[in-house]
Structures are given as structure tokens and as C-alpha cells.
């Protein structure tokens, strides 16, 4: 099966809000704690080994990486790799810069269609994961959680982790969050949930009504 995400390449790096590219294509951002497997997940979803890089020192990378999707000269969309969060050794000034950059990007970027939030399936919905959800909540845009590294859990533990996450996300709906909140199990090592994630991401990037119009032509 061919996926749009397989046509991905590095586009640019952003260190400050003023450097955000003046692009019009839809964007999907990838967020998650340091060591949650974000870079690995991006690479396997894009069918590449070294598209997204994990810092040798977790949490040290404090910039945003853009990847274009589709034709090189006429991208269909962009994937946006946000800095990993939650690593204790990051200096206070770097944390403050990261928080300002991410919260403003998440709340004001009009091109952003949704967030893919990576959580280690063994430790889902940490306080910092919840902060990411709460930063994004005012936009009303969808959040899809990938519970990574589920290969490290038994089948029953995986089911329990997914149920616990879905229950936690349901609390935001009860509190009035308007965006769609979904979750799935994911393992890059065992290739669990890859097709499911592909289909959801591409449905955000290419709305079904456009696909139906193209098919009719």
C-alpha cells in the first residue's frame, strides 16, 4: 500500500516564532515526551530510517523541524516535529523558550490541522502530556494519541493502557473540549498500528470531500 507520508523530506528548522515558514499547506504536528519514541515513529510512518533525528541528549533539541510531504516542488502538506519535553536536565531558560515557542505555535498556527501526541504506553497521560492537551484545547482541533512501545507490554497490559488513556481523554470531552480526542496502540518495532495511524493522518491532510471530488474527475 502506498502512503502520501512516504513522500517526505526535510524542509526547514525553526528556532523562533518569527522563523515559521510562510506556507499555506496544512500541517500536522508531532509532540511527546523525550524518549517516548517520537523520532522513531515519524521515521517508520514516513518509511525512512533517518528523516527525524533523536538527540543524543534527550530534551536538548529545542527547535521545530519541518518535513514536506508530496512532490518536492509542490508539497501537499507539512509534518512538524516539535521538541521533546519533560527531561529534567534541560536548563530553565531552555524550558522557558520551549514553552513559549510551543504554546504559541499550537494556539495560533492556522495551518495546523491536528496533533499526534506520543505517549509511552507504560506511562500515559503524565502531567506534561496533559499540559500539551490543555495548550491545544482552545483550538478545537483533533488530537490523536499514539501509545508507543506497546511491544513492551503484554496483550492485557496494552488493553488496560489503551482503556486508561481513553478514559483520561474522555474527561476533557466532559469538561467541554470541542476537538476529537482519540488513541491507539503503536509499536515501531513490531509494526503495530502503523496503517491505522497512516489513514488517520492522511484523512486530516486530505479531507474526504477532496478525495471524492478527485475520484469523480
Swiss-Prot record:
Lineage: superkingdom: Bacteria
Organism of origin: Paraburkholderia phytofirmans (strain DSM 17436 / LMG 22146 / PsJN)
Gene Ontology molecular functions: GTP binding; metal ion binding
Family matches, as InterPro entries: G_ENGB_dom (IPR030393), GTP-bd (IPR006073), GTP-bd_ribosome_bio_YsxC (IPR019987), P-loop_NTPase (IPR027417)
Pfam families assigned to the protein according to its UniProt record, in alphabetical order: MMR_HSR1
PANTHER family in the cross-refs: ENGB-TYPE G DOMAIN-CONTAINING PROTEIN (PTHR11649:SF13), MSS1/TRME-RELATED GTP-BINDING PROTEIN (PTHR11649)
Name used for this protein in its record: Probable GTP-binding protein EngB
UniProt-annotated binding residues for Mg(2+): 39, 61
Keywords: Cell cycle, Cell division, GTP-binding, Magnesium, Metal-binding, Nucleotide-binding, Septation
GO cellular component: cytosol
Named cofactor requirement(s): Mg(2+)
Domain EngB-type G, residue spans: 24-207
One GO term (biological process): division septum assembly
Function, in words: Necessary for normal cell division and for the maintenance of normal septation.
Cell membrane among keywords: no
Residues given in the record as GTP binding sites: 32-39, 59-63, 81-84, 148-151, 185-188
Similarity annotation: Belongs to the TRAFAC class TrmE-Era-EngA-EngB-Septin-like GTPase superfamily. EngB GTPase family.
Amino acid at each position: 500500500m502506498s502512503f502520501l507520508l512516504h513522500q517526505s523530506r526535510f524542509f526547514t528548522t525553526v528556532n523562533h516564532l518569527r522563523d515559521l515558514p510562510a506556507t499555506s499547506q496544512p500541517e500536522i504536528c508531532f509532540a511527546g515526551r523525550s524518549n517516548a519514541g517520537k523520532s522513531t515513529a515519524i521515521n517508520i510512518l514516513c518509511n525512512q530510517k533517518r528523516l527525524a533525528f533523536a538527540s543524543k541528549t534527550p530534551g536538548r533539541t529545542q527547535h521545530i523541524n519541518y518535513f514536506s510531504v508530496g512532490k518536492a516542488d509542490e508539497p501537499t502538506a507539512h509534518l512538524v516535529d516539535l521538541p521533546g519535553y519533560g527531561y529534567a536536565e534541560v536548563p530553565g531558560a531552555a524550558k522557558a523558550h520551549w514553552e513559549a515557542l510551543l504554546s504559541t505555535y499550537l494556539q495560533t498556527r492556522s495551518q495546523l490541522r491536528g496533533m499526534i501526541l506520543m505517549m509511552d504506553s507504560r506511562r500515559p497521560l503524565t502531567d506534561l502530556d496533559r499540559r500539551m492537551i490543555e495548550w491545544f484545547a482552545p483550538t478545537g482541533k483533533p488530537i490523536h494519541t499514539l501509545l508507543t512501545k506497546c511491544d513492551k507490554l503484554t496483550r492485557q497490559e496494552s488493553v488496560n493502557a489503551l482503556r486508561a488513556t481513553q478514559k483520561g481523554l474522555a474527561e476533557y470531552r466532559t469538561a467541554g473540549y470541542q476537538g476529537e480526542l482519540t488513541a491507539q496502540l503503536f509499536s515501531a518495532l513490531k509494526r503495530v498500528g502503523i496503517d491505522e495511524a497512516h489513514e488517520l493522518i492522511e484523512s486530516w491532510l486530505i479531507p474526504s470531500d477532496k478525495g471524492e471530488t478527485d475520484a469523480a474527475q
